[in-house]
Amino acid sequence: MTKKFVGLTILDGLGLTDQKENNAFHLAKTPYLDYLLKNFPNTTLKASGEEVGLPQGQMGNSEVGHLNLGAGRVVYQSLTQINKAIRDKSFFTNKQFLQAIEHVKKNNSKMHLLGLISDGGIHSHLDHFKALFDLLKENNLANNTFLHAFTDGRDTSPHSGINYIKDLLDYGFNIASVVGRYYALDRDNNWNRINLVYNMLTSKQAPVIDLPLEDTIQNFYNQGITDEFITPFITNPNGLINDNDAVIFVNFRPDRAMRLATALSNPCATNAFCSEGKTNFCGTKLLNNLFLVTMTKYSAQVKSVVAFEKITLKNIYGEVIANLGMHQLRIAETEKYPHVTFFFDGGKELQLKNADRILIPSPKVKTYDLKPEMSALEITTHAKTAILSGKYDTLILNFANPDMVGHTGFLDATIKAIQTVDSCLKEVLNAIFAVKGKACIVADHGNAEQMTDNQGNPHTAHTTNLVPFIVTDKNVVLKPGSLCDVAPTMLDLLEIKKPQEMTGNSLIKKLV
């Protein structure tokens, strides 16, 4: 039997729209993608809303996209799960929240809420903060609760933070500190950023600003500093995190929250996030008897109780391949490495048989418009070598550029990012063709195709647009579908029967 190879290349954040103005995908010169779309079967997929397990109209994201891609079924997301708990009131009897409340009362200490304050729905949601505050008011802890607000400006408008701050103040929150997500939610092991936030939260090592909070935020805007990049500052020194306190980390998505959560709960484990085995975490004050609740399970390193356990997904794509004794490779740079591993594997840290992983470090730049190529060239070099070795039966590869550079809001840089990916994609696919394999090309959500909003301001968030799906097999005809249909399609190309747990369907309508 001839060995078959199928490679999946994920063009992160590359959606489709008929709107051509300020559309980086349309404006970029992409001769190879143009060639693929002209010469090979292709279709469009839904990558947002209910089709990926999110509320109707909710934009997709990389975590959700990769979960659905790898699971081969619609994966109902934490956002949907938590929203449902608020509606049916089970949120207010959640055992873990009540344990945190009891801890505060027993120790006569403080309650802290921290997380990303926006309604972007990618990492957190403002409604969850409000529901928690309602619960704390019911338990007479409102006056002893402090909010540590991480401003967004990435999944939302760059200057929307001031409105979220006002909303929360009007709701009754006591905001003790503020910092942009660039510092608080770094996922590229920039521990100097995490250190700044940790020491602000615990040791008063940040400016204490007495101005009205909204005026302070406006001052940042006046200096050209958007929500994402607001530097740490304290508004209420009495609201710092101390021994015996309780913390509820309101982010439900783990990948950007896990480092700060580890620093708070298990600082000795911060080394686990560094490939060289040594972190630069240096918290001034280590906390004792801290009770930490995370909305979902962040990682094995985070010592917390988990408010909402995730549904266990069985027989995902990677497991099917491994159980058949086949070899697979996952490759991405730091920014998207968790997505081709943890998220593609159903939100689990799996050690699959015959599964290799290659992590390419992301460039150490403040924002990726400064290096729109990111690490795509290095990924391409390693991928080509691996494919041509003949060792592997399947490959999962992510090019982060359209999404990560698209998030900066800079059109020219995003165009360059897409052009880089186009040339790299050609090299990867030529290697696949050399081993007589087939390639699937997909995006996990939209972003780079819309670089401005309706008012002409930079649009740095994801979109709800359809995404492309291409199969380099001229003997098939494809039908439209959703991200959950990609894994069944890949199994179909490998002539492997999909497991019954995969409720997605092959997108191959018929053989020509």
From Swiss-Prot:
GO molecular function: manganese ion binding; phosphoglycerate mutase activity
Catalytic activity: (2R)-2-phosphoglycerate = (2R)-3-phosphoglycerate
Keyword annotations: Glycolysis, Isomerase, Manganese, Metal-binding
Pathway of action: Carbohydrate degradation; glycolysis; pyruvate from D-glyceraldehyde 3-phosphate: step 3/5
Cofactor names: Mn(2+)
Cofactor descriptive note: Binds 2 manganese ions per subunit.
Biological process terms in GO annotation: glucose catabolic process; glycolytic process
Pfam assignment, any one: Metalloenzyme
CC annotations in GO: cytosol
Residues that coordinate or bind substrate: H123, R154, D155, R181, R187, R253, P254, D255, R256, K336
Binding site for Mn(2+) 2: D12, S62, D444, H445
Catalytic residues, chain numbering: S62 (phosphoserine intermediate)
Signal peptide: none
EC number(s) from the headed UniProt entry: 5.4.2.12
InterPro entries for this protein: Alkaline_phosphatase_core_sf, BPG-indep_PGM_N, Metalloenzyme, PGAM_B_sf, Pgm_bpd_ind
Family per record: Belongs to the BPG-independent phosphoglycerate mutase family.
Assembly information from the UniProt record: Monomer.
Role this protein plays: Catalyzes the interconversion of 2-phosphoglycerate and 3-phosphoglycerate.
Name assigned to this protein: 2,3-bisphosphoglycerate-independent phosphoglycerate mutase
Gene source species: Onion yellows phytoplasma (strain OY-M)
Gene behind this protein: gpmI
